[in-house]
């Protein structure tokens, strides 16, 4: 390796905020099912604590050995609606508390998998779990929840969409003392993936191995710096530059994943190629798009710039890693990106533009604060729009929206840490209530029939 490459890597880490965003251990809980809920919870706690006991220590050891910052160590588990569904319990909040206790015991900052997959309909476990989400998120610190309401193969479960509007509203009310923080830990998906290492949407799919390590990388600052060097050049050059940069970023993720896998004695799963921003200056996806020539993110051309970025990151990343997966797209969470926050405050970026950007990226309406008086039906209609984009385009889409109690347009909602600060954005004031009240299922698109 040449000296300039070593120096480049050091500069990426020290100046351009290159890091590993998360090492996530996926743990199957299928062997923890029991007719007695209390017995099942004991098995769950024991398995998580046993499998993940050394996860944080290994992450810290890799960090110091290679000098690579590893921001989060996390756990994802089999959707609890499946596991708890075999018990006679009529409320699953105690399962959420068990996950929370296990997460605290092993020292991870989040545990995902308080989840239900209802794209085609509900089981008993799904019904109970979804009903319990607001209380579960209000009574735990580290538990993350997700619900899959649609897929390209099955269409959109509009009964679930309607219910999730109500669940988000109730969660915001129950966590009003933290400005609706519970909603920041709740994601509604279409086409959810089984190996996502990022929160809050991570769960461990039933088709996965018993235990696996997945890695999420992050390097918006590195990509922006690379594009600065090709100012004024045609898009072919920009795409090639992003590709080469993504290759280097992903190589680091591959290395960390393999080393963690060996040290923990657990198979290595995937590297998620998503570019994940943080509220820190110099760690923004919005600023990458602006570096391409946009005065401010949200103006005309934003969707095209995002398309170039997303595709080039994937092309470079795929070459660098044996197995890629997860969401693998650019994240555009408003509260977690300094450039997005500024664009909303300046009036350049609105919900409609973010919805258009969903056609390109992994999670569209992400970490968005809306007024506290936004109705459950309006929230459900936002979910339906996002799910439709995912289902029709055969891609993952999601909504993480916070109707922070007592807030109005222009207020700021403070979450702190990686979750950042969200400006409260206006929503369309015309009603979607009669549309959402219909219920039933929106059928799968014609091009879903591939067999």
Curated annotation (Swiss-Prot):
Q: Which domain of life is it from?
A: Bacteria
Q: Which InterPro entries match?
A: UPF0210
Cited Pfam families = DUF711
The disulfide bridges present are: none
Checking HAMAP family in the record gives: UPF0210
Question: Per the similarity annotation, which family is this?
Answer: Belongs to the UPF0210 family.
Quaternary state and interactors: Homodimer.
This protein is called what?
Answer: UPF0210 protein lwe0494
